């Protein structure tokens, strides 16, 4: 078999392939054995028609399409290996000739992985990260944890404050008319949560139980219900009940409830400070990696094919659907609630998908440029790490994966990321960032 690759514009080209006559004849023989089982010819049992009779009655050409179906997968795969191209999408194949006793030729229009023109990826400026835990950050975490132990208590007197949870009835109007979905009774709303239309929650602050208030808002221009987007609305609202959070005082007993390894408030604070500091160090390391990766990718020049973006979008939509399932929703329900459809979701994700593809291509190109290799020992260490992380045996991981190619690639990319960070130049955060 012979194959030649002719590059065209962009990331497209034509793969021209010639399959030897002996392989063609063998495929035609296989096609006959398959087709003859389905043929009825008077005077012969089904599946027992002699080859000469079949060809006389139907012509050998009747076998060509099945022969092509047999030949193409193997021939196309061998042609890819021979030319070294990296297709990123299904090809458009045109069989130019097939005949018994002769070579078969076909052409495949193929979109291939783009060439990556690497820019600077060593000596990148990466901002230093502040890993010192402040007393304010520690107290904020303590308050957050105590908040989980808070009890909701009915506020007998007094008005709504930020952080209260209120039970309300509301009836929404646009242009003096009620609109679908704008009414509810006995609805619980946490003031300050930002879960309602901007401006709604703030206007309830100061209202008391039993009081009514007209809340005037404007729907955002990007609101999912197009018929309401950008329109002014009035919600006639009644406050049925106000509850506030009764947050417990931090005592030794509460400290032990929050952290079973702490017997006193001081021990709890010490343990929490240690955990938060470790998390801050991890976050700082991840932020530096992300900044180095983004800069290396931005410095590279790549013409990303639409096919690769669409493949990445498929993966991202699937991941999004899995996250929705974890929250008890499927994609169909999400689309109904959000007023979106899949095409709109994909459009929102498109830029991120392109960035993902560009980043992966850049990291792979750096690995190639630096001749980064992965040893069997590297793979074994990664498998052991995965085994500890997921509490699954190494053998079970191997069986699930089928092979270690994915692990090998992950380790190779991680080595590239380590290289980027090791070669990076740490700089002080800009003034604007440090004041943020």
Curated annotation (Swiss-Prot):
Q: Where in the cell is it found?
A: Cytoplasm
Query: Its Enzyme Commission number?
Result: 5.2.1.8
Family annotation (InterPro entries): PPIase_dom_sf (IPR046357), PPIase_FKBP_dom (IPR001179), Trig_fac (IPR005215), Trigger_fac_C (IPR008880), Trigger_fac_C_sf (IPR037041), Trigger_fac_ribosome-bd_bac (IPR008881), Trigger_fac_ribosome-bd_sf (IPR036611), Trigger_fact/SurA_dom_sf (IPR027304)
Q: Does the keyword Chaperone apply?
A: yes
Top EC category: isomerase
Reactions listed under catalytic activity: [protein]-peptidylproline (omega=180) = [protein]-peptidylproline (omega=0)
Which SUPFAM superfamilies does the UniProt record give? FKBP-like (SSF54534), Triger factor/SurA peptide-binding domain-like (SSF109998), Trigger factor ribosome-binding domain (SSF102735)
Per the UniProt entry, the signal peptide is none
Q: Which UniProt keywords apply?
A: Cell cycle, Cell division, Chaperone, Cytoplasm, Isomerase, Rotamase
What family does this belong to? Belongs to the FKBP-type PPIase family. Tig subfamily.
The Swiss-Prot or TrEMBL note on domains reads: Consists of 3 domains; the N-terminus binds the ribosome, the middle domain has PPIase activity, while the C-terminus has intrinsic chaperone activity on its own.
The task this protein performs is described as: Involved in protein export. Acts as a chaperone by maintaining the newly synthesized protein in an open conformation. Functions as a peptidyl-prolyl cis-trans isomerase.
**Mind telling me what this protein is named?**
Trigger factor
């Amino acid at each position: 078999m012979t194959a030649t690759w002719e590059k065209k514009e962009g990331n497209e080209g034509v793969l021209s392939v010639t399959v030897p006559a002996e392989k063609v004849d063998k495929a035609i023989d296989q096609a006959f054995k398959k087709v003859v089982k389905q043929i009825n010819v008077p005077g012969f049992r089904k599946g027992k028609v002699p080859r000469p009779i079949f060809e006389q009655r139907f012509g050998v050409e009747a076998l060509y399409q099945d022969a092509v179906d047999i030949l193409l997968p193997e021939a196309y795969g061998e042609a890819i290996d021979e030319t070294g191209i990296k297709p990123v999408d299904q090809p458009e194949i045109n069989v130019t000739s097939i005949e018994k006793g002769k070579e078969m030729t076909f052409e495949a229009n193929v979109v291939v992985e783009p060439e990556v023109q690497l820019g600077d990826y060593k000596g990148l400026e990466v901002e230093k990260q502040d890993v010192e835990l402040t007393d304010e950050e520690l107290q904020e975490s303590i308050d957050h944890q105590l908040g989980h132990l808070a009890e909701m208590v009915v506020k007998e007197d007094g008005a709504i404050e930020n952080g209260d949870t209120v039970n309300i009835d509301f009836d929404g109007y646009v242009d003096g008319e009620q609109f679908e979905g704008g009414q509810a009774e006995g609805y619980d709303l946490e003031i300050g949560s930002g879960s309602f239309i901007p401006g709604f929650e703030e206007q309830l602050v100061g209202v008391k139980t039993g009081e009514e208030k007209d809340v005037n808002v404007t729907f955002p221009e990007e609101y999912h219900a197009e018929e309401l987007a950008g329109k002014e609305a009035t919600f006639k609202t009644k406050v049925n009940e106000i509850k506030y959070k009764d947050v417990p005082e931090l005592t030794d007993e509460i400290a032990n409830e929050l952290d079973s390894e702490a017997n006193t408030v001081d021990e709890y604070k010490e343990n929490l400070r240690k955990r938060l500091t470790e998390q801050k160090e991890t976050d700082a390391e991840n932020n530096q990696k992300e900044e180095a990766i983004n800069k290396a990718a931005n410095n590279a020049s790549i013409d990303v094919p639409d096919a690769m973006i669409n493949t990445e979008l498929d993966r991202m939509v699937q991941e999004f659907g899995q996250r929705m399932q974890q929250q008890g929703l499927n994609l169909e329900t999400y689309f109904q609630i959000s007023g979106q459809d899949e095409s709109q979701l994909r459009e929102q994700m498109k830029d991120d998908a392109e960035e993902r593809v560009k980043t992966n291509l850049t990291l792979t190109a750096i690995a190639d440029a630096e001749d980064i290799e992965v040893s069997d020992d590297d793979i074994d260490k990664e498998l052991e790490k995965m085994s500890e992380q997921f509490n699954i045996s190494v053998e079970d991981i191997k069986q699930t994966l089928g092979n270690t190619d994915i692990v090998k690639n992950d380790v190779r990319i991680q080595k590239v990321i380590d290289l980027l960070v090791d070669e990076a130049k740490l700089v002080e955060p800009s003034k604007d960032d440090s004041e943020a």
